[in-house]
C-alpha cells in the first residue's frame, strides 16, 4: 500500500501556517496603514448562517442562510476593508462561503487563499482620469452592473496582475489589464521545461495575459463590454432613466480552454420599488451550450408589513432542454419567508422551501440569522 512521504504531513502543516500568517499580516497591514488615514477608511461586512431540516427530519443542513435565488443565499462571512484617498487607496475583501449545502463553520478552509476575493492597491493620476491598479484585481469601473455584476470569469476572481483605467470624458471608462486569470502553467513534458528555460508550474507568457473592457454611463442608461484574448467576452445594457426601476441585461461568453464547448449565459433582471414597502422583481438565467438551452426564471415579491416584519416569496422555475433528456420536466421551487428585523443590521428569517418535483429538489424548512457590521 502506497503512503505519503513522512515529510508530507509536516509540509501541509507548514503551508497552512504560512497561509494563516500571510492572511493575518495582509489584514493587519491594511488596517494599520489605513488607520493612519482614518478619514477615507471603511470597514464593513456581515455574517449570515442558517439551519434547514427536511420534512421527514432525516437530514440537517447548515450551508443555507435562506433558500432561493433572489432573496436567498448560502451561509457566509464577509469582511470588506477599503481606503480611498485623494491620490490612491486600497481595497480588500475576505469572504468565506459554505463549502456545500451541508457545512459552513465545520469546514477546514477558513484560511484558504481562495477566500481572499480581492486585495488591490491603486494610484490616481490627473485628477483620477488615469488610475493604475495592482494586486488581486477587482473591477470597480466596467463590470456589467446587473444581477451578476461580473466581468471575465466572475467579478470576485479577476486574477492577480495589473490594470490601467482611463476616463477621458465623464461617464466613460476604458481599461487594459494583464493578469494570471486564464494563464496556463508549464508541464513537465513541455520543451521549455526540458530545456530548463522554464520550471514546471511556471505561468506561460502569451496573449491570454491580456483583457480589455469599457463602460459608458449617463443619466438614462449604461452599456459595458469586454474582450479577453483568452476568448472570454461580456456585455451589458442597463436602463437608469426611470426612478425606482432596475432593468439590466447581461451576456457572458466563455470559449476559453477551461470549457469543452463555448458557453453563453444571459441574465435579464428587472426590479421595481416604486410602491411603498413593496418590491416586485424577476430574474432570468439562460444558458446555451453546444446548441442546447436551459432556462431558469425567478419571479419574486416582498412586502414590509412594519419596520419589524417583512414577508417575501419567490419561485425559481427551471425549464430544461428536452433535446438533451426528454424525461426532464419543468419544475419550480417556491420559497416563502418571514423576516424579523431587530435593527437595520440584525435580522432573523424563518422559511420553507417547497418543490413541485422532489426528485429534482427536496422540501425543507428552517431559519437563518444575518448581522451586518
Predicted regions and their residues:
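Cleavable N-terminal export/targeting peptides
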Residues: 1-42, 129, 189-199
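Outer-membrane beta-barrel channels and translocator barrels
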Residues: 33, 38, 84-86, 125-130, ...
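Outer membrane beta-barrel
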Residues: 40-50, 68-185, 206-222
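Transmembrane beta-barrel strands of outer-membrane/channel proteins
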Residues: 45-51, 90-96, 132-136, 176-180, ...
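Outer-membrane beta-barrel "beta-signal"
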Residues: 50, 303, 338-341, 346, ...
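Residues that define the transmembrane beta-barrel architecture of outer-membrane proteins
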Residues: 66-77, 112-117, 154-160, 204-210, ...
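Residues on the lipid-exposed face of transmembrane beta-strands in outer-membrane beta-barrel proteins
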Residues: 75-83, 119-123, 162-166, 212-216, ...
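Detector for outer-membrane/organellar transmembrane beta-barrel domains
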Residues: 213-323
Amino acid at each position: 500500500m502506497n503512503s505519503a512521504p513522512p515529510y508530507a504531513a509536516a509540509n501541509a502543516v507548514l503551508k497552512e501556517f504560512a497561509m494563516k500568517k500571510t492572511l493575518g499580516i495582509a489584514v493587519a497591514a491594511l488596517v494599520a496603514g489605513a488607520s493612519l488615514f482614518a478619514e477615507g477608511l471603511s470597514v464593513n461586512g456581515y455574517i449570515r448562517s442558517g439551519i434547514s431540516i427536511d420534512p421527514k427530519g432525516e437530514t440537517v443542513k447548515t450551508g443555507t442562510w435562506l433558500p432561493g435565488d433572489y432573496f436567498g443565499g448560502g451561509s457566509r462571512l464577509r469582511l470588506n476593508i477599503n481606503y480611498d484617498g485623494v491620490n490612491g487607496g486600497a481595497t480588500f475583501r475576505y469572504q468565506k462561503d459554505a463549502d456545500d449545502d451541508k457545512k459552513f463553520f465545520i469546514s477546514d478552509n477558513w484560511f484558504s487563499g481562495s477566500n481572499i476575493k480581492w486585495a488591490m492597491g491603486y494610484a490616481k493620476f490627473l485628477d483620477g482620469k488615469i488610475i493604475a491598479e495592482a494586486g488581486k484585481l477587482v473591477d470597480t469601473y466596467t463590470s456589467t452592473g446587473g444581477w451578476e455584476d461580473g466581468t471575465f470569469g466572475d467579478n470576485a476572481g479577476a486574477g492577480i496582475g495589473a490594470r490601467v483605467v482611463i476616463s477621458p470624458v465623464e461617464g466613460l471608462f476604458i481599461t487594459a489589464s494583464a493578469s494570471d486569470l486564464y494563464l496556463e502553467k508549464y508541464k513537465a513534458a513541455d520543451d521549455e521545461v526540458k530545456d530548463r528555460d522554464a520550471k514546471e508550474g511556471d505561468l506561460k507568457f502569451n496573449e491570454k495575459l491580456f483583457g480589455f473592457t469599457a463602460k459608458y454611463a449617463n443619466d438614462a442608461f449604461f452599456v459595458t463590454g469586454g474582450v479577453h484574448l483568452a476568448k472570454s467576452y461580456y456585455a451589458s445594457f442597463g436602463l437608469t432613466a426611470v426612478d425606482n426601476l432596475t432593468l439590466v441585461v447581461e451576456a457572458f461568453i466563455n470559449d476559453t480552454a477551461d470549457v469543452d464547448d463555448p458557453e453563453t449565459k444571459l441574465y435579464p433582471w428587472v426590479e421595481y420599488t416604486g410602491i411603498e414597502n413593496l418590491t416586485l422583481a424577476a430574474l432570468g438565467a439562460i444558458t446555451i451550450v453546444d446548441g442546447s438551452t436551459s432556462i431558469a426564471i425567478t419571479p419574486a415579491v416582498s412586502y414590509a408589513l412594519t419596520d419589524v416584519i417583512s414577508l417575501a416569496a419567490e419561485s425559481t422555475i427551471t425549464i430544461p432542454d428536452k433535446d438533451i433528456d426528454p424525461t426532464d420536466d419543468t419544475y419550480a421551487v417556491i420559497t416563502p419567508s418571514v423576516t424579523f428585523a431587530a435593527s437595520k443590521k440584525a435580522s432573523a428569517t424563518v422559511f420553507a422551501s417547497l418543490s413541485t418535483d422532489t426528485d429534482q429538489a427536496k422540501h425543507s424548512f428552517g431559519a437563518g440569522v444575518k448581522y451586518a457590521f
